[in-house]
From Swiss-Prot:
One of its GO terms (biological process) is electron transport coupled proton transport. It catalyses: a ubiquinone + NADH + 5 H(+)(in) = a ubiquinol + NAD(+) + 4 H(+)(out). The gene is MT-ND4. This is NADH-ubiquinone oxidoreductase chain 4. The keyword Transit peptide does not apply. GO terms for molecular function: NADH dehydrogenase (ubiquinone) activity; ubiquinone binding. It holds the Pfam family Proton_antipo_M. It is found in: Mitochondrion membrane. The chain crosses the membrane at residues 1-21, 34-54, 63-85, 89-111, 128-148, 156-176, 211-231. Keywords: Electron transport, Membrane, Mitochondrion, NAD, Respiratory chain, Translocase, Transmembrane, Transmembrane helix, Transport, Ubiquinone.
Length: 231
């Protein structure tokens, strides 16, 4: 069910990050070198999840692996136990909660009209659902973490914290963000661009679907304008 996917991506997946934050408070803060294997493992897991996204043909699976890759960055930022790392992790968890939930909602909107989640079979929707294409563009840009969104703030804080802790981590972070941009653009182009299937009879988007997207993006934009609420 789409509601379960939205709750899982937006709330339940972030409970793991919250649990790690609480556990790190009782661990020694001066011996972060002992956590180096876990940080490398988290960043490597994020890269592998991003590479898995590139080879996905199922729209819902692609969005799910995207959530896993972002949580890898969150775990790495939490483990180094710095104020910037914790602030970036909190910002990225909240921002990606809204973004991934919105992407699952859009995937369901597409599935209800095409009855398939295969990327190549959902192409050409910009000709018949232009407003939905606008929502797809906005959510994909937020998934890429362009400024001035909260996603960008979180990733910038995480990148700065990890770079100050160990400069070589910038290689893995940069590679992860490059692949994130690649699969996000691939997802948008595969579902929206191209010729429209001739036998595809769809109905226009409803006000309920637009309201769902507004309720996802407006709070995220408001938090982006005043990040002091969570950082």
């Amino acid at each position: 069910p789409i509601a379960g996917s939205m709750v899982l991506a937006a709330i339940l997946l972030k409970l793991g990050g919250y649990g790690i934050i609480r556990m790190m408070q009782i661990l020694p803060t001066t011996k972060t070198d002992m956590f180096l294997p876990f940080i490398v493992l988290a960043l490597w897991g994020a890269i592998l999840a991003n590479l898995t996204c590139l080879q996905q043909t199922d729209l819902k699976s692609l969005i799910a692996y995207s959530s896993i890759s972002h949580m890898g960055l969150v775990v790495a930022a939490i483990i180094i136990q710095t104020p910037w790392g914790l602030s970036g992790a909190m910002a990225l968890m909240i921002a990606h909660g809204f973004t991934s939930s919105a992407l699952f909602c859009l995937a369901n909107t597409t599935y209800e009209r095409t009855h398939t989640r295969i990327l190549i079979l959902t192409r050409g929707l910009h000709n018949i659902l232009p407003m939905a294409t606008t929502w797809w563009l906005l959510t994909n840009l937020m998934n890429i973490a362009i400024p001035p969104t909260m996603n960008f703030t979180g990733e910038l804080l995480i990148m700065s914290a990890l770079f100050n802790w160990c400069p070589t981590t910038i290689i893995m972070l940069g590679l992860s963000m490059l692949i994130t941009a690649s699969y996000s653009l691939h997802m948008f182009l595969s579902t929206q661009m191209g010729p429209t299937p001739l036998n595809n009879q769809t109905e226009p988007t409803h006000s309920r679907e637009h309201l769902l997207m507004i309720l996802h993006l407006i709070p995220l934009m408001m938090i982006s304008m005043k990040p002091e609420l969570i950082i």
